[in-house]
Design a protein with these regions (language model features):
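C-terminal capping/lid region of NAD(P)-dependent oxidoreductase domains
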Residues: 3, 286, 291-297, 308-328
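Glycine-rich beta-strand-centered segment in the early N-terminal region that forms part
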Residues: 24-41, 51-95
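NAD(P)H dinucleotide-binding glycine-rich loop of Rossmann-like/cofactor-binding domains
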Residues: 87-150
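N-terminal Rossmann-like NAD(P) cofactor-binding module of classical short-chain dehydrogenase/reductase
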Residues: 89, 147, 212-215, 237
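Mid-domain Rossmann-like dinucleotide-binding core that forms the NAD(H)/NADP(H) cofactor-binding site
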Residues: 123-196
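Short amphipathic alpha-helix with an adjacent loop that forms part of the alpha/beta core around
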Residues: 198-209
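Glycine-rich phosphate-binding loop and adjacent beta-alpha segment
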Residues: 221-293, 325-328
Length: 328
């Protein structure tokens, strides 16, 4: 058996490092399963992994991709808790940008029936990140305000969707003005572009309530402006650095505004919490999908063989996810 896989043999720029290769799959052992890829996502963290700047480096050569959904097509003779046809989380440890894999059956996450394929493919990073950002740092209640940059990112959209359900008001920052109406259609309360001095009008926008929580995934000047928009005693959480620019935090706000700084990485949260807590997290997400609160916006699907075009598209300004579809 063989499988098409998008691999890298060294760390560096995506277009220079990634190659499509046919890799041999091992014969299935009694305690293993054979999984075919249904769909996989392209995330900013994938770029960082390939460049060697994100998380823990993999042993090379490595298959790219951190997130995806697969279907079990064969089980080993000792496997009795799984069956062909079930959807499972495609193993991140093996890389998700490949047509198929063979892996131990123990520990595979089985997905509930009825999930839209685009939601199943984007389930494991951004939805739990959005949930934790709104639940773990500040006690928020209906009517409270938060502010976030990169509001059109996958996490940003999930934050808007979840905040709307919880009654939390969102002040959203984007780079392109044409995205304002699209985000408002999703439930965003206020949307500003980066060049607008939104931090000066915060009290007016919020009716004097102020802003308790800032969510930063950009860095640089954008992150600093979020701090300026926070109310005294507010919390600023950084969970990404898409601009690759350092943050020079304004001393005045830190000292006299009593601003609190925090960082967040969903991988660390998953590792530091019990399996029961992780399972509960995903049960909450499944419920939000079922009721229609969470949905993934897709801009375009690509085959794995068209990975170069897919990555070029993913690196451009857009509204929605770029996804890989597995072969039929």
């Amino acid at each position: 058996m063989s499988s098409l896989a998008i691999r890298y043999h060294q760390y560096g720029k995506l277009q220079e490092c990634l190659v499509a290769e046919e890799v041999s799959l091992p014969e299935i052992e009694p305690d293993q399963v054979h999984i075919k890829l249904l769909a996989a996502s392209i995330n900013p963290s994938d770029f960082g992994m390939i460049m060697g700047s994100y998380g823990q480096k993999k042993e090379l050569p490595a298959v790219a991709g951190r997130e995806g959904v697969g279907e079990i097509i064969e089980i080993g003779k000792n496997v009795n808790h799984l069956k062909p046809g079930q959807w499972v989380q495609f193993p991140e440890s093996l890389g998700t940008w490949q047509e198929a894999c063979v892996i131990d059956a123990e520990g595979l996450k089985v997905l509930p029936e009825g999930l839209p394929i685009e939601m199943a493919a984007t389930l494991f990073i951004n939805p739990p990140t959005a949930w934790r950002l709104l639940h773990d740092f500040v006690e928020l209640k209906s009517g409270d305000w938060i502010i976030q940059n990169a509001a059109n990112s996958a996490v940003g959209i999930f934050v808007i969707q979840l905040a709307k359900k919880l009654g939390i008001k969102t002040l959203n920052i984007v780079r392109r003005k044409e995205l304002k109406e699209k985000l408002k259609e999703l439930g965003a309360d206020e949307v500003f572009s980066e060049e607008e001095e939104y931090w000066k009008t915060g009290p007016e926008i919020t009716g004097g309530k102020g802003i308790k929580l800032a969510l930063n995934s950009v860095g640089g000047e954008s992150a600093i402006n979020l701090i300026k928009g926070l109310s005294p005693g507010g919390t600023h959480v950084t969970f990404g650095a898409m601009s690759f620019e350092p943050i020079r935090f304004p001393t005045r706000q830190l000292i006299f505004g009593d601003i609190k700084l925090a960082g967040f990485w969903i991988d660390s949260w998953m590792r530091s919490h019990s399996q029961k807590e992780v399972d509960t997290q995903f049960e909450n997400i499944y419920a939000l999908i079922k009721e229609g609160t969470f949905s993934t916006i897709v801009e375009k699907w690509y085959s794995l063989s068209a990975f170069k075009e897919a990555l070029e598209h993913a690196a451009q300004p857009r509204f929605g996810k770029i996804l890989f579809r597995g072969e039929e």
